[in-house]
Amino acid sequence: MSEEKNYELWLDNYFFKPNFWQKCLAFILLPLSVFYAFFAILNTFFRKKIVFKKPVISVGNLSFGGNGKTPLCKAIAREFDGVFIVLRGYKRKSKGLFVVKNQNEILCTLTQSGDEAMEYAFEENIKGVIVSEDRVKGIEKAFELGAKIVVLDDAFSKFHIKKFDILLESKIKPYFNFTLPSGAYRLPKFYEKRADFIALEGRDFVRYSFVKENPKAVLVTAIAKPFRLYEHFIKARACYFFKDHYEFKKEELENLLKKHNCDTLMLTFKDFVKVKDFGFKCQIIELNIELKDSLREKIKTYIKEFEQ
């Protein structure tokens, strides 16, 4: 078992199903969580509210790690025309604003965009993708390029932007209702009251995940909360988990395939965009979300406000 796999599984256990010693550690770190929460709350005040003349929708979550924001953003883009995605571009090797995609043309490299932005760029229904640390500048650029709707990936905490906030509520909740580092929350849990819509799996959207069993495949992934792929672990000969946004090396993947006498990598699309030029045979784990009427109609109602 690799160090990366140990690290990811330890974090998953610590935040969601801690053992006795991990619970003790969480309480030892509680003073740090109080300081973290204080400064996180301060950061949400004292900024002038910015209002746009077109719809801005945010998809976010309170807890650390992935909850399905990317598939939900894609689902919104499939339902509505003219969607641009604006995101920070976490772990990219660039600074400032980059137009990753504009009207079906990819305009930058993976190192400039980051893996999540490039995953969005390959989605046909998404008309544009922009990465920017400054979300306001990213939104302005998107509308300048012709966006009808801007969807912000992971921007719930950007309370200075007037937007429709969709907060994803995971089926698997953190063990403690503490902020980091004692718990998995990035903002105190009471902040969920500031959401315009709390989206619950099963009630407001349905998640689909599919891949065929392949005994000649090694499942490799670098996503947050890899246990989300649990149902697929038995479909490959071996599984390896790396840190979220990990930059794969061709040689290490070759060694994993040789070690298990396999010829195929089983990956999510987010992982695939980082290895597509390596020349490996790949099998994609399909991760999709379908909106239910409760969420779809709320979004439609919000968008119609701008048509008046």
Swiss-Prot record:
One of its GO terms (cellular component) is plasma membrane. InterPro entries: LpxK (IPR003758). ATP binds at S63, F64, G65, G66, N67, G68, K69, T70. One of its GO terms (molecular function) is tetraacyldisaccharide 4'-kinase activity. Pathway: Glycolipid biosynthesis; lipid IV(A) biosynthesis; lipid IV(A) from (3R)-3-hydroxytetradecanoyl-[acyl-carrier-protein] and UDP-N-acetyl-alpha-D-glucosamine: step 6/6. It catalyses: a lipid A disaccharide + ATP = a lipid IVA + ADP + H(+). One of its GO terms (biological process) is lipopolysaccharide core region biosynthetic process. The keyword ATP-binding applies. It comes from the Bacteria. Keywords: ATP-binding, Kinase, Lipid A biosynthesis, Lipid biosynthesis, Lipid metabolism, Nucleotide-binding, Transferase. Its EC number is 2.7.1.130. Belongs to the LpxK family. NCBIfam families: PRK00652.1-5 (NF001892). Transfers the gamma-phosphate of ATP to the 4'-position of a tetraacyldisaccharide 1-phosphate intermediate (termed DS-1-P) to form tetraacyldisaccharide 1,4'-bis-phosphate (lipid IVA). This is Tetraacyldisaccharide 4'-kinase. The gene is lpxK.
